[in-house]
UniProtKB/Swiss-Prot annotation:
Zinc finger residue extent: TFIIS-type: 83-123
GO biological process: termination of RNA polymerase I transcription
Chief localisation class: nucleus
PROSITE patterns, per database record: RNA_POL_M_15KD, ZF_TFIIS_1, ZF_TFIIS_2
Function noted in UniProt: Core component of RNA polymerase I (Pol I), a DNA-dependent RNA polymerase which synthesizes ribosomal RNA precursors using the four ribonucleoside triphosphates as substrates. Can mediate Pol I proofreading of the nascent RNA transcript. Anchors into the Pol I active site to monitor transcription fidelity and cleave mis-incorporated 5'-ribonucleotides.
UniProt source species: Macaca mulatta (Rhesus macaque)
Subcellular localization, as worded in the UniProt entry: Nucleus, Nucleolus
Protein name (database record): DNA-directed RNA polymerase I subunit RPA12
Record remark on domains: The TFIIS-type zinc-binding beta-ribbon domain contains an acidic hairpin motif (residues Asp-106, Glu-107) that likely coordinates the nucleophilic water and magnesium to cleave the scissile phosphodiester bond and release the mis-incorporated 5'-ribonucleotides.
Length: 126
């Protein structure tokens, strides 16, 4: 038997039963069928190979803290660094800003400015 013949009959990986021994993908849990089939490459494992294997799952719920209500003056848009920019509504010098990636990743960010005096907002695409 040649090496090429052996390659077709044995798997590429030596792995735990959680993973496909042919391509390395995570295997689905055994069901009512006689074999467990890898959803990626179609490699089959006899379901009897899984006898005695215990599957344990657990769900942990973490208690959430209480949310503190924000007043209008203390909202997230009023926080952040302040730049020397004149508010077009009230003329106040000084606007807080924050940035967001609103468009596709290969385009610039959108800068949101908020007047620290009258809370007027404007945006600028950079």
């Amino acid at each position: 038997m040649s090496v090429m013949d052996l390659a077709g009959t044995c798997s590429s990986f030596q792995s735990d039963l959680d993973f496909c021994s042919d391509c390395g993908s995570v295997l689905p849990l055994p069901g009512a069928q006689d074999t467990v089939t890898c959803t990626r490459c179609g490699f089959n494992i006899n379901v009897r190979d899984f006898e005695g294997k215990v599957v344990k799952t657990s769900v942990v719920f973490h208690q959430l803290g209480t949310a503190m209500p924000m007043s209008v003056e203390e909202g997230p848009e009023c926080q952040g660094p302040v730049v020397d920019r004149r508010c077009p509504r009230c003329g106040h010098e000084g606007m807080a800003y924050h940035t967001r990636q609103m468009r596709s990743a290969d385009e610039g960010q959108t800068v949101f400015y908020t007047c620290t005096n009258c809370k007027f907002q404007e945006k600028e695409d950079s």
